[in-house]
């Protein structure tokens, strides 16, 4: 479950239909405890995770400690579903987020509306944190594409519309489309959820998200249209990787401005290797 979903559920159980007013009440409670420490506590549900803080996340972490006591949860449980900054870098321009023991490239974090699985909302009553990350395009449990719009055309973002699955514009239940079914996308979603999916590598979850970041860098996208290519790449590993390196060398030799003798390895293979500095890992056992 995402941290946003948790707060929405707590708000609903305490009689708040709009989570914003619940957060306003929570902030008032926290300010009574320590005005200076909790002055920056957000009342926008989209900014509730510690990583959203512009300067530092200590005050939000302290706030989660207090809220865990109010909701009768262990602090470690509530902090375990929060997204925090992490010092690890997946590439020179890509920092990481950490949730529990799972490290995810920040580049995959969705910036717009968060799509959802209507079946999950109806069956489980909460939202998954995986919905917040590109690459996870299908629900691996219900084999349906995540949606961000109701059939009436209105955007459905659970952070504002809630967890009921009811469109705030037309009042109808949102439903998953069975059109354009992509079994390959579901296989990738299952793999990102921790399942063993051949031919994809059996590695820890953090590495799987790292591979999605790497693939998005070399293919400029990790959307549905590249799912077949992604699976084929691992099906023919390592020959597919050797072929990719060969293409990159040929292209950079042909279009280079400098003479070949002046080229650095970074100039030739930068997109493949330097854009993903965490791969391969120092731990040889984790290498593919």
Feature locations, PLM:
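Basic, alpha-helical nucleic-acid-binding regions used in initiation and control of genome expression
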Residues: 1-288
